[in-house]
UniProtKB/Swiss-Prot annotation:
Protein name: Endoplasmic reticulum resident protein 29
Oligomer status and interactors: Homodimer. Part of a large chaperone multiprotein complex comprising CABP1, DNAJB11, HSP90B1, HSPA5, HYOU, PDIA2, PDIA4, PPIB, SDF2L1, UGGT1 and very small amounts of ERP29, but not, or at very low levels, CALR nor CANX.
Native organism taxonomy: Eukaryota, Metazoa, Chordata, Craniata, Vertebrata
PROSITE patterns per the UniProt record, alphabetical: ER_TARGET
Main location: endoplasmic reticulum
Presence of keyword Ribosomal protein: no
Biological processes annotated in GO: endoplasmic reticulum to Golgi vesicle-mediated transport; negative regulation of gene expression; negative regulation of protein secretion; positive regulation of gene expression; positive regulation of MAPK cascade; protein secretion; regulation of endoplasmic reticulum stress-induced intrinsic apoptotic signaling pathway
Signal sequence region: 1-34
Entry keywords, A to Z: Endoplasmic reticulum, Phosphoprotein, Signal
Length: 262
């Protein structure tokens, strides 16, 4: 009788255990597969529609239910680094086309192809219908530079907030005289820049001068040139220097140009 009762009790508990195990799998760290990534908010078909409309910028990664590998490692770093931005929320949606078909509604809404996972969309000002697709390499630096080009402020290595703002004003200025005045403002500001930051502040000024001499296409062509250089074998310190130069150049790219590339 006791044995029978034990079997009966175990049988009655099994549905509950199944639910608990499912929840544990869903929110387990990536080592055991699941959707919990430090710095990223996991969303589903319910929370997605609650979170996006209330946020200025949300970068959402749509991926398999249990992602892993190099691209996922890059995403983990990106999510952790997002703490530097007060206006950006990083989120992820896990999708499964079998079993319970987890979040397939969102996959269909945004016409996602599982062969292309991970897919990144930037949602702006709560707009659920017109997110911006990211088409670049799944690398932390590349995604950060793209986000910066979309108007998301990120405290990226090498970048100085005051000179980022000047770069934005410089690009928006419609006359040579106005741009020359902004360049002069930046030159005067060097006196108050920390010694450790003067090298990078000077880079902003150098780029402004190059744009005045060579035209609007300079930032894009210089980014392409440095991007190719980084692919070559070099010391970590040299690569870090070039990455900082790329980060600074991003401040001079127009949002319209970013949209056209997509």
């Amino acid at each position: 009788m006791a044995a029978a009762a034990g079997v009966s009790g175990a049988a009655s508990l099994s549905p509950l255990l199944s639910v608990l195990l499912g929840l544990l799998l869903l929110f387990a760290p990536h080592g055991g597969s699941g959707l919990h990534t430090k710095g990223a908010l996991p969303l589903d078909t319910v929370t997605f529609y609650k979170v996006i409309p209330k946020s200025k910028f949300v970068l959402v990664k749509f991926d398999t239910q249990y992602p892993y590998g190099e691209k996922q490692d890059e995403f983990k770093r990106l999510a952790e680094n997002s703490a530097s931005s007060e206006e950006l929320l990083v989120a992820e949606v896990g999708i499964s086309d079998y079993g319970d078909k987890l979040n397939m509604e969102l996959s269909e809404k945004y016409k996602l192809d599982k062969e292309s996972y991970p897919v990144f969309y930037l949602f702006r000002d709560g707009d659920l219908e017109n997110p911006v697709l990211y088409n670049g390499a799944v690398k932390v630096g590349a995604i950060q530079r793209w986000l910066k080009g979309q108007g998301v402020y990120l405290g990226m290595p090498g970048c100085l907030p005051a000179y980022d703002a000047l770069a934005g004003e410089f690009i928006k200025a419609s006359s040579i005289e106005a741009r020359q005045a902004i360049l002069k403002q930046g030159q005067d500001g060097l006196l108050s820049v920390k010694e450790t930051e003067k090298k990078w502040a000077s880079q902003y000024l150098k780029i402004m001068g190059k744009i005045l001499d060579q035209g609007e296409d300079f930032p894009a062509s210089e980014m392409a040139r440095i991007g190719k250089l980084i692919e070559n074998k070099m010391s970590d310190s040299k690569k870090e220097e070039l990455q900082k130069s790329l980060n600074i150049l991003t401040a001079f790219r127009k949002k319209e140009a970013e949209k056209e590339e997509l």
